[in-house]
């Protein structure tokens, strides 16, 4: 299992949209990169200069929206994940 460090989270990104709301099927090069994902692992939080740790605002299982160009894609056990800093998370989907 992957364990993120510091203020990072590991996301299982939602698949790219294959068709538009109107039902038009998109070519593979026209698909938009999804900006939502499900958190599967959370780091311990940000460590301040005085040694205190600020806990994360999100938890495992949350579905979140993240910045379009945020994160680093990693592969682990034949699956792709996204490692993102908490500051690059925009919202939690409720």
Curated annotation (Swiss-Prot):
<dbReference type="GO" id="GO:0044183">
    <property type="term" value="F:protein folding chaperone"/>
</dbReference>
<protein>
    <recommendedName>
        <fullName>Co-chaperonin GroES</fullName>
    </recommendedName>
</protein>
<dbReference type="GO" id="GO:0005737">
    <property type="term" value="C:cytoplasm"/>
</dbReference>
<dbReference type="InterPro" id="IPR020818">
    <property type="entry name" value="Chaperonin_GroES"/>
</dbReference>
<dbReference type="GO" id="GO:0046872">
    <property type="term" value="F:metal ion binding"/>
</dbReference>
<dbReference type="InterPro" id="IPR037124">
    <property type="entry name" value="Chaperonin_GroES_sf"/>
</dbReference>
<dbReference type="InterPro" id="IPR011032">
    <property type="entry name" value="GroES-like_sf"/>
</dbReference>
<keyword id="KW-0143">Chaperone</keyword>
<dbReference type="GO" id="GO:0051087">
    <property type="term" value="F:protein-folding chaperone binding"/>
</dbReference>
<dbReference type="Pfam" id="PF00166">
    <property type="entry name" value="Cpn10"/>
</dbReference>
<dbReference type="GO" id="GO:0051085">
    <property type="term" value="P:chaperone cofactor-dependent protein refolding"/>
</dbReference>
<comment type="subunit">
    <text>Heptamer of 7 subunits arranged in a ring. Interacts with the chaperonin GroEL.</text>
</comment>
<comment type="function">
    <text>Together with the chaperonin GroEL, plays an essential role in assisting protein folding. The GroEL-GroES system forms a nano-cage that allows encapsulation of the non-native substrate proteins and provides a physical environment optimized to promote and accelerate protein folding. GroES binds to the apical surface of the GroEL ring, thereby capping the opening of the GroEL channel.</text>
</comment>
<dbReference type="InterPro" id="IPR018369">
    <property type="entry name" value="Chaprnonin_Cpn10_CS"/>
</dbReference>
<dbReference type="GO" id="GO:0005524">
    <property type="term" value="F:ATP binding"/>
</dbReference>
<keyword id="KW-0963">Cytoplasm</keyword>
<comment type="similarity">
    <text>Belongs to the GroES chaperonin family.</text>
</comment>
<dbReference type="GO" id="GO:0051082">
    <property type="term" value="F:unfolded protein binding"/>
</dbReference>
């Amino acid at each position: 299992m992957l364990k993120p460090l510091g203020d990072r989270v590991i996301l299982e990104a939602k698949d790219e949209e294959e068709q538009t709301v109107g039902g038009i099927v998109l070519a593979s090069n026209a698909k938009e990169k999804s900006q939502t994902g499900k958190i599967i692992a959370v780091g311990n939080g940000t460590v301040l200069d005085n040694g205190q740790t600020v806990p994360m605002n999100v938890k495992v299982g949350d579905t979140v929206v993240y910045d379009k160009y945020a994160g680093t894609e990693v592969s682990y056990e034949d699956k792709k994940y996204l490692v993102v800093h908490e500051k690059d998370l925009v919202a939690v989907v409720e």
